[in-house]
Amino acid sequence: MKFIVSSTALSSHLQAISRVINSKNALPILDCFLFELEDGTLSVTVSDSETTMVTTVEVNESDTNGRFAVVAKTLLDALKEIPEQPLTFLINPDNYEITVQYQNGKYSLMGQNADEFPQSATLGDNAVRVEMEAEVLLGGINRSVFATADDELRPVMNGIYFDITTEDITMVASDGHKLVRCKTLAAKGNERAAFILPKKPATLLKNLLPKEQGSVTIEFDERNAVFMLDSYRMVCRLIEGRYPNYNSVIPQNNPYKVTVDRLQLLGALRRVSIFSSQASSLIKLRMQENLIVISAQDIDFSTSAEETLVCQYAGNPMSIGFKSTFLIDILNNISADEIVIELADPSRAGVIIPVEQEENEDLLMLLMPMMLND
């Protein structure tokens, strides 16, 4: 079996899919790339038994069809060191010996029998299909994946919930402290449907989608989802279970509204939070007429900080406490210049929305408050 392929094309595709591979695998074959050559098309597959990713690479020349597995790390490290040039792969089908010939030399390594590689999951007849622009899907994942939980007791919270209707698609993530709801009007389904995408495949998509143009086709049933991109195909196990009613936790009547420059607030939080209690990271926001006072103190070390920002606020003076790391996370994942913080009282969640929404998008973030001692 022989084929010739561009070194940089192969290396970049292998690099992209190698993130699927776990550092420790129960099955040794899962440390490998599965190469399959069929009618002049080379496809390479990786799997961690829950997520499988396949990429296709153009070959310049090939002879017979065939398949083999090869340890991913060895091949990746070897290809990284070769500048752009054609590589000739020669595979002995009897003992899986692989020779990679390049301009001034060759590599020899042992492959493995491809039959041991696990089959990827297939979808049932009741699979639902939706299409989204790559840019829209990337935007939703980017804004929400940081809010997913790591909760063994409530696994449904460990992923992004895709709520599909005939009018829009909403992506939701929450860890019980913060919540993100990103609704896009630029995509919709033919019927009401939903699925929960685990954090790992969501992060894999986050890395792949910036390179993609055009639309992504998503097909899913109760157990698995398939994401079809131009050069990649990802099959992943979904999180099974019922996602909580996210709309019911978003406070509807918030009489106090603070409009503030996002980057100014972010800078102030980063400075002031250095002096917050290491145990709680509590910062206090005190709103008064057109001013917001951000303060923190660490009683154990007798340190404190306070900073005042100009904002738009016309209500009664009010104070609320938040965990600074969570609030910084939220502000980092909004791109608008100005934000509105909507509040009802110090014991209810704060709703944070951009003053100017992106086109065809409705983004809302929510943060639970912390108790203030004073």
Protein language model annotation of sequence segments:
Residues 1-374:
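Structural preference for solvent-exposed beta-strand-turn elements
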